[in-house]
């Protein structure tokens, strides 16, 4: 038996001028642009700092994305223990971090997909954030499996999937297509999902508000 999962698709709509500039970007260039975007970094960091329970933030690139996320989340959540895990962290330290989280609450782990998508069992993981785009079905489902362990401290687990919308006209950006594929995975696995789409400024505004909640999301199919 597994913990029920609720998926929250948080769609970041970029300004029209940005979408136009990125319309013909190669996949690698688009990903580079997104993971180094300062406003995106701030939005994801605020999401992590405000998320409930023990939180796992997953990223792809250590130096240009993971470490800046870790630093900013520490600044935003000084009252919480924030841990960093990548291939640079040895197995003993990873195990110590796992035990801290397993025995605590309101812990935040900022970890690379490669080190945390498989092989680490933390039953009391409450919230997971996909901070980097990922199109691998196996990686997505393995990562989700980290949060589905049963634990008395949770009635469900929450996945925050950050979606980057650079669409303009008929042009659909690479990472948005990958997000559409992830939604197909969620549907196939019968994970209920909600969606909230806001411009970057609106995301910053909503997350800066002390009463802000990611629960304002619009349920799939609703107007």
What name fits each language-model region?
Residues 55, 82, 157-159:
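Hydrophobic/aromatic residues located in beta-strands of well-ordered beta-sheets
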Residues 10, 85:
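Hydrophobic residues at beta-strand termini and immediately following loops
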Residues 56-58, 83, 129:
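Conserved beta-strand elements of the Class I
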Residues 87-185:
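Conserved RecA-like P-loop NTPase helicase motor core
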Residues 52-53, 79-80, 105-106, 125:
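Short, high-confidence coil segments that cap the C-terminus of an alpha-helix
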Residues 1-4, 16-18, 141, 149-216, ...:
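A conserved SF2-helicase RecA2
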Residues 73-80, 188-191:
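Short helix-loop-beta junction
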Residues 21-60, 64-75:
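Conserved interdomain hinge at the start of the Helicase C-terminal
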């Amino acid at each position: 038996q597994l913990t029920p999962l609720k998926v929250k698709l948080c769609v970041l709509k970029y300004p029209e001028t940005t979408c136009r500039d990125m319309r013909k970007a190669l996949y690698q260039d688009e990903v580079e642009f997104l993971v180094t975007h300062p406003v995106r970094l701030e939005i994801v960091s605020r999401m992590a700092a405000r998320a409930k329970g023990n939180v796992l933030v997953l990223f792809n690139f250590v130096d240009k994305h993971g470490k800046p996320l870790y630093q900013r989340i520490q600044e935003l959540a000084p009252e919480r223990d924030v841990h960093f895990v990548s291939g640079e962290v040895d197995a003993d330290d990873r195990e110590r971090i796992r035990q801290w989280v397993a025995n605590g609450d309101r812990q935040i782990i900022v970890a690379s997909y490669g080190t945390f998508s498989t092989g680490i069992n933390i039953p009391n993981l409450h919230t997971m954030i996909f901070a980097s785009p990922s199109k691998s079905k196996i990686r997505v489902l393995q990562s989700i499996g980290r949060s589905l362990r049963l634990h008395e401290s949770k009635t469900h687990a929450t996945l925050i999937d950050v979606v980057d919308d650079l669409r303009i006209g008929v042009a659909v950006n690479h990472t948005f297509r990958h997000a559409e594929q992830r939604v197909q995975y969620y549907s196939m696995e019968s994970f209920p999902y909600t969606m909230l789409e806001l411009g970057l400024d609106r995301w910053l505004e909503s997350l800066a508000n002390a009463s802000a909640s990611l629960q304002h999301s619009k349920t799939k199919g609703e107007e």
